[in-house]
Regions:
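Acidic, surface-exposed loops and disordered segments
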Residues: 1-246
């Protein structure tokens, strides 16, 4: 992939449309990604209408790109199609459980990432919205998702109208382990995060939030224990309602 070393999240798009032909080709090509037992345990809901984007926006904290992007794609863990196929072929499906959700979520995220790679090769811009699993029930209601279908990722898609700077990444040694997992000593943590913490934009981020360290911004402001626990409870409730937990 020629674009992987320059990829960035794009949140602003031109008014140029993404053609149906191009979108269908990219989604079709993305189907070649890895999938458990060749079952393709995913679906994608394509949203183009202004009304539907307006209804989806609150589930993503009203981030502007949801309504401004030409296309919004919601990728779903989907065991419904496989379950109905089994029932219609005199088979007894047993996919209303946590393992099945995990398998379907993995399939859906692989499909999503492969699609993003292909789209960026075509010059399109994408932004991955992690908010999909924060308030999934709202998305389920808007998209009318049936039992055994759960949204796990959302992508806004369009032709870029910005060229943001590349974001930093940890060094390879921070994430790569040889043969067994090498746990992190304080010294290794210091070394791996030194460059990130020294970036001027991150130092300003700490100052604006009135914190002592960058880590505190993440734990105290952006991804708090209270929010994580509340959204975890909400996600578990959705898995029950959608038939993956009994």
């Amino acid at each position: 992939m020629k674009t992987i070393n320059t990829r960035r999240s794009i949140r602003k798009y031109t008014d140029a449309p993404v053609s149906e032909k191009l979108l269908r080709r990219l989604l079709s090509e993305a189907e070649r990604t890895q999938t458990m037992r060749n079952l393709q345990l995913y679906s994608v809901v394509v949203t183009r209408s202004e009304e539907q984007k307006r209804r989806l926006a609150p589930a993503h904290y009203n981030q502007p790109m949801v309504e401004e992007a030409p296309v919004v794609l919601t990728f779903c863990a989907d065991y419904r199609r496989t379950t109905l196929w089994a029932k219609n072929r005199n088979a007894d499906p047993g996919y209303d459980n946590m393992l099945s959700f995990q398998n379907a979520a993995t399939d859906a995220l692989l499909f999503c990432q492969t699609f993003c790679n292909l789209a960026e090769e075509e010059g399109l811009g994408c932004c991955f919205l992690g908010t999909t699993v924060y308030m999934p029930q709202m998305i389920i209601d808007v998209l009318q998702l049936p039992e055994l279908v759960v949204p796990v990722a959302t992508i806004t898609l369009g032709w870029p109208d910005e060229q943001p700077a590349l974001t930093d990444r940890l060094p390879l040694d921070a994430i790569m382990h040889e043969e067994t997992y090498a746990d992190y000593t304080p010294e290794r943590i210091d070394r791996f995060y030194a460059e990130k913490e020294a970036l001027e934009e991150n130092r300003e981020f700490v100052r604006l939030n009135g914190k002592q360290t960058l880590a505190q911004v993440y734990t105290d402001c952006r991804y708090t224990r209270k929010d994580n626990e509340a959204m975890s409870a909400g996600l578990l409730e959705v898995l029950k309602k959608q038939g993956f937990l009994r």
